[in-house]
Regions:
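N-terminal export/assembly segments and adjacent metallocofactor-ligating motifs
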Residues: 1-233, 247, 251, 257, ...
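Molybdopterin (Moco) oxidoreductase catalytic core of the xanthine/aldehyde oxidoreductase family
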Residues: 237-248
Length: 274
């Protein structure tokens, strides 16, 4: 380790993909936020604030471990890397390179994930995946088809301009604390309505102006009922639909056969709440 004196530097929080600015003070051992380009309010969530604690935590692994019977024993880095090389070489020789698979992580940097996939290619396989596929691949595909881009179509600051939020099947109060505490909650306190669709009650529910406790697995009937109410009560933005949305006619024709009360009750929600 270097004996050079360390000074706090502005960096990016490594916990998730929001990209909040973070700086670390070695004297206090605390992490604080700064007004970065993404989170301009300079706030960090408890998870990001605890990022530095992981580095020095007593349970953090700093030495390679290999299995010995029912337990793990420490070995040198040279031994561990040698075992990996020997095992990979044996697998490639016996079953071919496509018997290998590499699983990347969203908690790694872009550079780390890039190096991992280059190692996979060097060994002759394209079997590279990422943990984000389990939770985001369907989102990216659906948003790409419906909105033209598999990512958010607005900035965080745009959230403050909304008159109402519809949060379905998510708990941003705990899952996305920066967005919730810095953007959603202040707006709700200023009069923006928050409609929370979730079978459970949680911190997001407690901040919501309306809670629709949909039965698990019945989101589609609920959303069909909501859509029919919007159409029946003339709440659509016709100018927006005309210039920005395709397939409006087919969409409205589908709802000719949708009965609001039946779908709402199927979803376990009082039709009057819609």
């Amino acid at each position: 380790m270097s004996n050079r004196p360390t000074q706090p530097r502005e960096s990016i929080c490594p916990y998730c993909g929001v990209g909040c600015g973070i700086t670390y003070d070695p004297e206090s051992g605390k992490a604080t936020g700064w007004n970065g380009p993404v989170n301009t309010r300079g706030e960090i969530c408890p998870k990001g604030a605890a990022a530095g604690e992981i580095v020095a935590h007593e349970d953090r692994l700093t030495t390679p471990l290999v299995r010995d019977g029912d337990s793990f024993v420490p070995v040198s880095w040279a031994t561990a890397l040698g075992n990996i090389v020997a095992t990979f070489s044996e697998i490639v020789e016996t079953d071919g390179p496509d018997a290998l698979a590499f699983f990347a992580s969203s908690n790694c940097t872009n550079e780390e994930n890039y190096v991992l996939q280059k190692v996979a290619r060097a060994l002759g396989t394209n079997n590279v995946d990422n943990c984000a596929r389990l939770c985001h691949s369907s989102t990216v595909a659906a948003m790409g088809e419906r909105f033209g881009a598999g990512a958010m179509t607005n900035t965080l600051d745009d959230l403050r301009e909304a008159d109402a939020y519809l949060v379905a099947g998510a708990n941003p109060a705990e899952q996305h604390p920066i967005i919730f505490r810095s953007y959603l909650l202040p707006a709700v306190r200023d009069g923006t309505e928050l409609i929370h669709v979730d079978p459970r009650e949680n911190d997001t529910t407690r901040a919501a102006t309306h809670h629709l406790p949909v039965k698990p697995g019945f989101d589609i009937p609920l959303l069909n009922a909501v859509s029919k109410v919007i159409l029946e009560e003339g709440l659509t933005d016709e100018a927006f639909l005309e210039t920005r949305v395709d397939g409006v006619e087919a969409f409205t024709e589908f709802f000719d056969s949708v009965v609001v009360d039946d779908n709402a009750r199927l979803a376990g929600v009082d039709p009057a709440d819609l």
